[in-house]
């Protein structure tokens, strides 16, 4: 790759059709696990003009009003205007749910699993809920150890939502997207090439009715109230060469489920690293913690983040894979892209010895079953928009760096030699 290149990542707001589905799916997860932490949940949601369909496989003792949950989440997002073609009060909500397949359950369910703390033998007895491969990544481009492009794209969308919900820009509507292109030199971010924002808006703004004037007003406001606050204290800022694009089609009045059908699990790159790292293909939202697509991807992020936080590497990508019904990973790989300061073979061995990667162990260490109940019925839905990883606004167990000292001690002679 050239020493100078551009890299782009995108994000979407919580009002994007696919993200509505992710949030409803994870709201269902929260509600069920808060009542019955041993539940098995695979909740899929589809939204279209005036319609919500909740489907999937759920095995639980919890009593949940799925229709009420969906309507409340839709209202919280901001779909309360009937003229948008989709609103919490007027949309139809259909529910079509089955129980989890007995063939799948037999490889995962064990009597010991209902206890809080499991022995080594019991951890080995609880298999993965499916086969699959998962990735986790961290790099030192941002304080939260995430790639800069996706970090900024999420910040733009979160600020876009904030100015809408506070009424600062009352003409904005819930649907929106961002895209940020970063200039890199020798593998390090050095500039902001392009900032793109597409945001749904009302047909007129106050007395402004001309389309060109409306778009000019939106562009001016978004720079002042969205872009400038984000970059106020940033080390890398937009400059006179930075392109700022807003609603490039010239109009974005029809949006949300009226404009596009939405489906759970279609924003997996936005949920993770913005394309900067590889992805195993499995979505997160709507899945209980026994699904390794979700829990093991969180564990991979935890490993990668601790390695970078310990300054053992500038970049780190972790891959693990599982077989259905088998507790221990089939394979594990650590890639540091030539930035490792320690022996990579030893690094892999140290990680295997000190990080729990059996599904029941991940669930136990991160407390993934009990967090919805402990946090008032709200945990997974909060990561269903604006990224599951690198969230500085949330207390997430997989974002902790509590293994840093252990890793440093394991490599202290090598690190001292490298420093000298």
Swiss-Prot record:
What cellular-component terms does GO give this entry? cytoplasm
Q: Which GO terms describe its biological process?
A: one-carbon metabolic process; S-adenosylmethionine biosynthetic process
Pathway-wise, it operates in: Amino-acid biosynthesis; S-adenosyl-L-methionine biosynthesis; S-adenosyl-L-methionine from L-methionine: step 1/1
Cofactor details (free text) = Binds 2 divalent ions per subunit. Binds 1 potassium ion per subunit.
Region labeled Flexible loop — which residues?
100-110
Gene3D superfamilies referenced in this protein's UniProt entry, alphabetically:
3.30.300.10
Tell me the compartments it is located in.
Answer: Cytoplasm
- The positions annotated for binding L-methionine are 57, 100, 260, 291
Name the positions where K(+) binds: 44
From what superkingdom does this record's organism come? Bacteria
Which cofactor is essential here? Mg(2+); K(+)
EC numbers: 2.5.1.6
- Report the InterPro entries cross-referenced here: ADOMET_SYNTHASE_CS, S-AdoMet_synt_C, S-AdoMet_synt_central, S-AdoMet_synt_N, S-AdoMet_synthetase, S-AdoMet_synthetase_sfam
- Gene Ontology molecular function, alphabetical: ATP binding; magnesium ion binding; methionine adenosyltransferase activity
Per UniProt, where does Mg(2+) bind?
18
Q: Which positions does UniProt annotate for ATP binding? A: 16, 175-177, 251-252, 260, 266-267, 283, 287
Q: Name one Pfam family in it.
A: S-AdoMet_synt_C
Known catalytic reactions: L-methionine + ATP + H2O = S-adenosyl-L-methionine + phosphate + diphosphate
This protein's UniProt keywords: ATP-binding, Cytoplasm, Magnesium, Metal-binding, Nucleotide-binding, One-carbon metabolism, Potassium, Transferase
Protein role: Catalyzes the formation of S-adenosylmethionine (AdoMet) from methionine and ATP. The overall synthetic reaction is composed of two sequential steps, AdoMet formation and the subsequent tripolyphosphate hydrolysis which occurs prior to release of AdoMet from the enzyme.
Q: What's the family?
A: Belongs to the AdoMet synthase family.
Quaternary context: Homotetramer; dimer of dimers.
> What is the protein name for this chain?
S-adenosylmethionine synthase
The upper taxonomy is: Bacteria, Bacillati, Cyanobacteriota, Cyanophyceae, Oscillatoriophycideae
